Amino acid sequence: MKKKLLLLLPAFVFAQSFIISNIPLPKTYIQNLSPLECNTYCMQNYLDNGQVFSFLAYAGSKLKDAKQNEARELFVPIFNLGSIHNSKQLKIALLLPYKKIGKYASSVTNASLAYLMTKGHPFMLKSYKIESENIEDLSSVIKRIHKDGFEYIIAPLTHTGAKNISNLDPTIHIYFPTINKQDSNSTSPYFIFGAIDYHAQSNLLLKEAYEPLVIFSDKSKIGKALAAYQREEFSYSSIDDLGSSSLFGNTFSIFSQINEESNKPIKQTTKEILNYSVSRRTTNLESYLKENEKIADATIIVNTPIIKTGMILSQLTLYDVNETNILSTQINYDPLLLSMTQYIDRKEMVIANSITEHNNILIETNALLGNDIEYDWINYTTTIGIDYFYSLITGDERTYNIKIKDNQMLYDIELLQPARSQFVRYIRPTRERDFMQKEQREEDQ
């Protein structure tokens, strides 16, 4: 026992306590002493020769060259470079109904933190957790946020929470990464909506659809809503317009849809549409698929989560459905699809994706925090919102070139296919059946 005490004695004698200092790290400022200008070629030459500080002397703001700007964004946090906006306070609050949004309370926080960490600007990011989204809780927390001196809020709320905040009508800037403006009646100039547009994605996908259209959905709100919308939209005769922007794999701009809204055609009700609602516990689709002539050569739409989608794809192959193609919105843009399904099951699949702008520095910084902004659209739209607020507060140019119209972020849409090991751009095949189906409808009329 004495020996043990003697062995522990040095540990007690030389023990130290470690407290994190509240003194901020010193900033690095690079002064450009050269009277000469430096163009893109000149700056690239500095990078190629490892003259990092000479490069940074000319890189005081966002650069036009994407690769050079990426290098600049990498060096700013490494050297803790000082910002010309150092005097401005950068304070952003996170309003988190953690019981409602689950894991996203953490991932939204990480996405916000990852973005601000790359900017080299002093910031205060504070989380305000609430148990419910009722008006009383929201009113109380917004008053507290305002009292604490915050004027910008990231609020990943459900539709109920967004509706209640809209009724409160606070005069404070709020960004909703989970809500699309078409799902809100708010006219507040202080609200910005950041969610992707499932309707626009469905419209683009339906241009690739054939009759009969078979819609598989789960019993969730989004599954039911998408099924109802797609069924309604496919009933319009011009939805299979041959002028689809995906013909050569081009990215579809949301503005083209806005311009076409006023030209919606007369409803065509003769199209054959089948709607199957699959419960969470259902694992066998034999009754839907086996020897079902109604779905031969059909277009299949899957409005189901990734696990359920994998089950549907495998059973489409098992029961020799011989579908023409399989369509899905952002729900199934997930690398898990590539590993959990066979290529033969997914080779005819087309997925709409609105995560079209990528910043490698932010992707890698998020990855260090165990976060994903490359495939998870809520984390991605959160990053877009933080970027927007950062630009408003500091006056810096935005990192992402996402347009805003009527307080809604407008995301371009691309159509992708899950190939053998990655998602690739979709190129529409020859569509002879379009003309055959059109002629058949004209004969029927």
Protein language model annotation of sequence segments:
Residues 2-5, 9, 16-445:
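Extracytosolic ligand-binding ectodomains
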